[in-house]
Amino acid sequence: MSHSVKIYDTCIGCTQCVRACPLDVLEMVPWDGCKAAQIASSPRTEDCVGCKRCETACPTDFLSIRVYLGAETTRSMGLAY
């Protein structure tokens, strides 16, 4: 099952999440919106197993990256009973 990985604008380009991911789901891409001139991107979300190591590694208090597991995605969309 793939999971939704969202990168938010609080990314500081530190690469901690990329290094923490055991499946190389994340990568850094050029971006002019931060001092590091790069931001995390998730081009391979279908490979995400939902371990949330990227969230744990993120120094911006879990605000840069969110991994939504299948049940969480359903709840957040108001589809759960």
Swiss-Prot record:
Cofactor: [4Fe-4S] cluster
Binding-site residues for [4Fe-4S] cluster 2, renumbered to this chain: C21, C48, C51, C54
EC number(s) from the headed UniProt entry: 1.97.1.12
InterPro entries xrefs: 4Fe4S_Fe-S-bd (IPR017896), 4Fe4S_Fe_S_CS (IPR017900), PSI_iron-sulfur_center (IPR050157), PSI_PsaC (IPR017491)
Signal peptide: none
Pfam families: Fer4_7
Keywords: 4Fe-4S, Electron transport, Iron, Iron-sulfur, Membrane, Metal-binding, Oxidoreductase, Photosynthesis, Photosystem I, Repeat, Thylakoid, Transport
PANTHER family the UniProt entry points to: PHOTOSYSTEM I IRON-SULFUR CENTER, PHOTOSYSTEM I IRON-SULFUR CENTER-RELATED
Role, per record: Apoprotein for the two 4Fe-4S centers FA and FB of photosystem I (PSI); essential for photochemical activity. FB is the terminal electron acceptor of PSI, donating electrons to ferredoxin. The C-terminus interacts with PsaA/B/D and helps assemble the protein into the PSI complex. Required for binding of PsaD and PsaE to PSI. PSI is a plastocyanin/cytochrome c6-ferredoxin oxidoreductase, converting photonic excitation into a charge separation, which transfers an electron from the donor P700 chlorophyll pair to the spectroscopically characterized acceptors A0, A1, FX, FA and FB in turn.
Protein name in UniProt: Photosystem I iron-sulfur center
